[in-house]
Amino acid sequence: MLSRRGHRLSRFRKNKRRLRERLRQRIFFRDKVVPEAMEKPRVLVLTGAGISAESGIRTFRAADGLWEEHRVEDVATPEGFDRDPELVQAFYNARRRQLQQPEIQPNAAHLALAKLQDALGDRFLLVTQNIDNLHERAGNTNVIHMHGELLKVRCSQSGQVLDWTGDVTPEDKCHCCQFPAPLRPHVVWFGEMPLGMDEIYMALSMADVFIAIGTSGHVYPAAGFVHEAKLHGAHTVELNLEPSQVGNEFAEKYYGPASQVVPEFVEKLLEGL
């Protein structure tokens, strides 16, 4: 019997030809006419909570498995939302307000990745596990938020996604449907499929360089991206505060604060272009 990961990879590979044609419309996959642009590597970057920690974004989960003194099951699962939507909305309202405080700003690591995108243009793609918007605020534009976005909400009936910067209450409804439905945070909860997976696996199959930054290596499917990239011949790099659970999979490794190791590595990479 296939595992969930096995089913996902099987489905991806069956649709590979169709996906390749569709994904060429994304800037990461589009071939350029200018010869020198073709010589630049395709770089896929994965970021996790470690890149935003120095900006003041807390990583939520503590050593005891609690998120801000709440059980994960209560605030980060569909079942928890069904049981107590008011508690779940209050939890994410607090996170949303924190993200918009003036002291929360992109740090040197975010800015370095924006600089890397500027240099690589169409051949750069950023996949983040983070639900904040610090990459966009730093200047990155080609970003896949595989775990959703804190400053958006989703209609629980139609799935339509809406920009939302204020608090959400149980009384707030989506009016995109024939019958107004409750709004929920546009966040991937435990037990739900991450977003953009077909695009991500396609990008992994085409990347020349795969870089993981600030990730723990605990959470799948993201923890398996390095293995997938290696299967397709990508050079793999880990930039982290300490070795991740899958650190031995990487060909190149640098450890230290993200605001230090990421800019240093980006400069090294740019020198080689």
Curated annotation (Swiss-Prot):
Gene Ontology MF terms in the entry: histone deacetylase activity, NAD-dependent; NAD+ binding; NAD-dependent protein de-2-hydroxyisobutyrylase activity; protein-malonyllysine demalonylase activity; protein-succinyllysine desuccinylase activity; zinc ion binding
Assigned keywords, A-Z: Cytoplasm, Metal-binding, NAD, Transferase, Zinc
Binding-site residues for substrate, renumbered to this chain: Y92, R95
Catalytic activity annotation: N(6)-acetyl-L-lysyl-[protein] + NAD(+) + H2O = 2''-O-acetyl-ADP-D-ribose + nicotinamide + L-lysyl-[protein]; N(6)-succinyl-L-lysyl-[protein] + NAD(+) + H2O = 2''-O-succinyl-ADP-D-ribose + nicotinamide + L-lysyl-[protein]; N(6)-(2-hydroxyisobutanoyl)-L-lysyl-[protein] + NAD(+) + H2O = 2''-O-(2-hydroxyisobutanoyl)-ADP-D-ribose + nicotinamide + L-lysyl-[protein]
Catalytic residues as annotated in Swiss-Prot or TrEMBL: H147 (proton acceptor)
Cysteine pairs bridged by disulfides in the record: none
Name the UniProt record assigns to this protein: NAD-dependent protein deacylase
Taxonomy of the source species: Bacteria, Pseudomonadati, Pseudomonadota, Gammaproteobacteria, Enterobacterales
Annotated gene: cobB
